[in-house]
C-alpha cells in the first residue's frame, strides 16, 4: 500500500485476507462491511500525538514524512491504543501511528527464558510498540489489543536509562546487552523513523554495551552510512 506523499511503501499483508474473511460471513455482515473492506484508508493516514510529545525532534521528523496525514492531539497514548472493542486484524489493514512520550521505566530486565549472551546483564526496552508486519506466528497479535503502532519520541530518556545502568551492572566485568526490538521490528521502521541508526551511533559512544536488533527487514541500505 503506497502512502501518498511519503515516497516509500509500508508493507500491508492483511487486507486481502481480511477481505476474504469478512466477505465469507453472513449476508448482513457482508453487506455492511464490503465497501469498507475494499476501501481502507492508507496506512498512517491519521497520526495521534500526545500533547506532551509535540516538542521532540522525532515528532517533527515523523510528521514531515506524512504531510497529508490528519494529526489528532490526544492526552495519553493508551486512550487510543488500549481502548476496548478494537479488531487487531482489521486495523492492520489501515494502521494508524501514535506518537507518545514514555514515562519510566525505560529499561526492563530480560526474562530468564531468553538467550543469556554469556552475561547476566541482559535487558530490553520498548522504543516502539507493535510492528509494521503482521506475521502469523508473531506473539504481538495476542499481546496488544490494537493493530496500530506506538512510537515513543523521547529517545534520550531511553539512552539515559542505559547510561545509569552501565554504572551498576550485576557483573561489571561483562557487557550489557539491550534488545531494542523486543516488541517491534525497529529496522522495518527505519525509512519512517531512523531509530536504528540513532541507536547504533549511541552504542559507538559506549565501551561495555551491545544492542540486539532482530529483524526480517531488508532495509540495511538505510544504515550503511551509520
Task: Give each language-model segment a name.
Residues 98-117, 121, 136, 140-225:
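Conserved Radical SAM active-site core
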Residues 2, 7-8, 12-121:
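Flexible, acidic/Gly-rich N-terminal and inter-domain linker regions that tether
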Residues 125-135:
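Cysteine-centered iron-sulfur cluster-binding motifs in ferredoxin-type domains/subunits
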Residues 54, 130, 187:
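Glycine-/small-residue-rich active-site loops that bind phosphorylated ligands and cofactors
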Residues 48, 71-73, 124-125, 179-180, ...:
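A structural signal for short, well-ordered beta-strand segments and their strand-loop junctions
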